[in-house]
From Swiss-Prot:
The gene is TAS2R40. It holds the Pfam family TAS2R. This is Taste receptor type 2 member 40. It comes from Pan troglodytes (Chimpanzee). It is a multi-pass membrane protein. It comes from the Eukaryota. Several bitter taste receptors are expressed in a single taste receptor cell. InterPro entries: TAS2R. The lineage of its organism: Eukaryota, Metazoa, Chordata, Craniata, Vertebrata. PANTHER family: TASTE RECEPTOR TYPE 2, TASTE RECEPTOR TYPE 2 MEMBER 40. One of its GO terms (molecular function) is bitter taste receptor activity. SUPFAM superfamilies: Family A G protein-coupled receptor-like. Gustducin-coupled receptor implicated in the perception of bitter compounds in the oral cavity and the gastrointestinal tract. Signals through PLCB2 and the calcium-regulated cation channel TRPM5. Keywords: G-protein coupled receptor, Glycoprotein, Membrane, Receptor, Sensory transduction, Taste, Transducer, Transmembrane, Transmembrane helix. It is found in: Membrane.
């Protein structure tokens, strides 16, 4: 069995590193929580009023809610892993944090992938019968596909609770030139199982993203050739929609690839708990959901207008409270 072992003692704690990690990742998480919470509140309020949400808005609600959960969970894990080490390094608590983190990451990726597939089918233009069939059926199938995505994410994250992570503590490590002892925390990771379940959980949605981006690029190329030398080509709404969707997909893929690498390295325990590389992984992991939540708001005209109204109303509300 291929395993990776790391250890850390109480002396490894650096107050500067702990403070720096908590502040930077905390700012990122709070930014993401505000963004995801805003999206959830907008679409959740419409759903609570009994309105039937369009398919795209329904996916956005699921994505923003799962992302809100992920960011809150990441903040909790950072606090526990850095400030409450005794509790965090209990085997059951450690495994619980890792499994739920992977589950929420996989769910987020699936929901984001379905969102891109949905907009690809709306924007791209092909004459193939299969494309027309998918375009007609996607609205009916989407609720079931979202539920299936949750089950698939669970099926590739729950096995991580068995025979992958193991944490134990030795409280009797002697300190040289001293009669006292110190605690030493040992983490063991089964790399074979981690690589299999982690990669299988992200493989299909990443392929969906790449296919959606490829179809959008091909559709844009066909549309550009069709427009020819039309002087209004650069202002054509279809071309703008294509370019906007391609930019959004590219932005997400860049963010997610960095996040996937950072999450895997963090899960594998390759780096020491308080090493600079491990801190960098935590910061990258917090940046991905925050960055994509901001991009979703900026890239959606309805959410952009709602955010501007929110910014205008908050000072008025605060002013009224002080009177």
């Amino acid at each position: 069995m291929a395993t990776v072992n790391t250890d850390a003692t109480d002396k490894d704690i650096s107050k500067f590193k702990v403070t720096f990690t908590l502040v930077v990742s905390g700012i990122e998480c709070i930014t993401g929580i505000l963004g995801s919470g805003f999206i959830t509140a907008i679409y959740g309020a419409e759903w609570a009023r009994g309105k039937t949400l369009p398919t795209g808005d329904r996916i956005m609600l699921m994505l923003s809610f799962s992302r809100l959960s992920l960011q809150i969970w990441m903040m909790l894990e950072n606090i526990f892993s850095l400030l409450f080490r005794i509790v965090y390094n209990q085997n059951s608590v450690y495994i619980l944090f890792k499994v739920i983190t992977v589950f929420l990451n996989h769910s987020n990726l699936w929901f984001a992938a379905w969102l891109k597939v949905f907009y690809c089918l709306r924007i791209a233009n092909f004459n193939h019968p299969l494309f027309f069939l998918m375009k007609r059926k996607i609205i009916v199938l989407m609720p079931w596909l979202l539920r299936l995505s949750v089950l698939v994410s669970l099926s590739f994250s729950f096995p991580l609770s068995r025979d992958v992570f193991n944490v134990y503590v030795n409280s009797s490590i002697p300190i040289p030139s001293s009669n006292s002892t110190e605690k030493k925390y040992f983490s063991e990771t089964n790399m074979v199982n981690l690589v299999f379940f982690y990669n299988m959980g992200i493989f299909v949605p990443l392929i969906m993203f790449i296919l959606a981006a490829t179809l959008l690029i091909l559709s844009l190329k066909r549309h550009t050739l069709h427009m020819g030398s039309n002087a209004t080509g650069s202002r054509d709404p279809s071309m703008k929609a294509h370019i906007g969707a391609i930019k959004a997909t590219s932005y997400f893929l860049i963010l997610y690839i960095f996040n996937a690498i950072a999450l895997f390295l963090s899960m594998s325990n390759i780096f020491d708990t308080y090493s600079s590389w491990n801190i960098l992984c935590k910061i990258i992991m917090a940046a991905y959901p925050a960055g994509h939540s901001v991009q979703l708001i900026l890239g959606n005209p309805g959410l952009r207008r709602a955010w501007k109204r929110f910014q205008h109303q908050v000072p008025l509300y605060l002013k009224g409270q002080t009177l």
